[in-house]
C-alpha cells in the first residue's frame, strides 16, 4: 500500500512540475524577431498613435506570425498580429466608432493589421487591465490577455475586476508569472510570457 501511494505521489508531483515547465521546448526567437523587425517602421507609427511600445508590438508579431503577413491560424486568426475579425477586430472597430468587423484582406494588410493590433492592446490597457501599476507586470498581463483574453486572467485573481487588479498590484513580475503558471487555465499563457522575454532579448 505504501509503495502504491509513493508511486502515485511521484506521478502527481511530476504532473505538477510539468505544468509549470513552460520553457520547454525551447523557443529560438532570433529568426522570428528578424522577420518581425522589417515591420518596425509601421510598429513605431502604430505604437505612437495608440501609446504602445513598438518593441512589444514587434515581439507579438514575432510570436504570433513570425513576421508573415499572410499567416492564418486554425482558429482563423489572421495576419502579422493574428487578429480574429469577430473578436479583437470587432472590438477595435467599435473603439473607432465603426460597425461590423475587418475583412480578411484588411487583416492581411501589414499596416492595417499592426494598427488594429496596437489599438487592441490599448483597449486592454485602458479597459480591463486599467490600474496595473508595475510596467513589467502590465506588459505580462497585456500579452496574456492578448492571447487568451483579459477575463480569463483576471478571474484567476478574483471575479471582481477591482479586487483582481488590487491583487495583481501586490505582485512583482516574477510573482505574477508564477501565479499565471500555477493558476491560468491555458497552459500557453506562461509560455507566452517566456516567448515575450526571448523576443525582447533578441532585439
From Swiss-Prot:
One of its GO terms (cellular component) is cell outer membrane. Keywords: Cell outer membrane, Cell wall biogenesis/degradation, Lipoprotein, Lyase, Membrane, Palmitate, Signal. GO terms for molecular function: lytic endotransglycosylase activity; peptidoglycan lytic transglycosylase activity. The N-terminus is blocked. The keyword Signal applies. Disulfide bonds: none annotated. One of its GO terms (biological process) is cell wall macromolecule catabolic process. It is an enzyme of class 4 (lyase). Residues 1-15 form the signal peptide. InterPro entries: EmtA (IPR023946), Lysozyme-like_dom_sf (IPR023346), Transglyc_AS (IPR000189), Transglycosylase_SLT_dom_1 (IPR008258). A lipid is attached at residue 16 (S-diacylglycerol cysteine). Gene3D superfamilies: 1.10.530.10. PANTHER family: ENDO-TYPE MEMBRANE-BOUND LYTIC MUREIN TRANSGLYCOSYLASE A (PTHR37423:SF4), SOLUBLE LYTIC MUREIN TRANSGLYCOSYLASE-RELATED (PTHR37423). Murein-degrading enzyme. May play a role in recycling of muropeptides during cell elongation and/or cell division. Preferentially cleaves at a distance of more than two disaccharide units from the ends of the glycan chain. Prefers cross-linked murein in vivo. NCBIfam families: PRK15470.1. This is Endo-type membrane-bound lytic murein transglycosylase A. It comes from Escherichia coli (strain K12). The lineage of its organism: Bacteria, Pseudomonadati, Pseudomonadota, Gammaproteobacteria, Enterobacterales. The gene is emtA.
Amino acid at each position: 500500500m505504501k509503495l502504491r501511494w509513493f508511486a502515485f505521489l511521484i506521478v502527481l508531483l511530476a504532473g505538477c512540475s510539468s505544468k509549470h515547465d513552460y520553457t520547454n521546448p525551447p523557443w529560438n526567437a532570433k529568426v522570428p524577431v528578424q522577420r518581425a523587425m522589417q515591420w518596425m517602421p509601421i510598429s513605431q507609427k502604430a505604437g505612437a498613435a495608440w501609446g504602445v511600445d513598438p518593441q512589444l508590438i514587434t515581439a507579438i508579431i514575432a510570436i504570433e506570425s513570425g513576421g508573415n503577413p499572410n499567416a492564418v491560424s486554425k482558429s482563423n486568426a489572421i495576419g502579422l498580429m493574428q487578429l480574429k475579425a469577430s473578436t479583437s477586430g470587432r472590438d477595435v472597430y467599435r473603439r473607432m466608432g465603426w460597425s461590423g468587423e475587418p475583412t480578411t484582406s484588411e487583416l492581411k494588410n501589414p499596416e492595417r493589421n499592426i494598427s488594429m493590433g496596437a489599438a487592441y492592446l490599448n483597449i486592454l490597457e485602458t479597459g480591463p487591465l486599467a490600474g496595473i501599476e508595475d510596467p513589467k507586470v502590465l506588459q505580462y498581463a497585456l500579452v496574456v490577455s492578448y492571447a487568451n483574453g483579459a477575463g480569463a486572467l483576471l478571474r484567476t485573481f478574483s471575479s471582481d475586476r477591482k479586487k483582481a487588479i488590487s491583487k495583481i498590484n501586490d505582485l512583482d513580475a516574477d510573482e505574477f508569472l508564477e501565479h499565471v503558471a500555477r493558476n491560468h487555465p491555458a497552459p500557453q499563457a506562461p509560455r507566452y510570457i517566456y516567448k515575450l522575454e526571448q523576443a525582447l532579448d533578441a532585439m
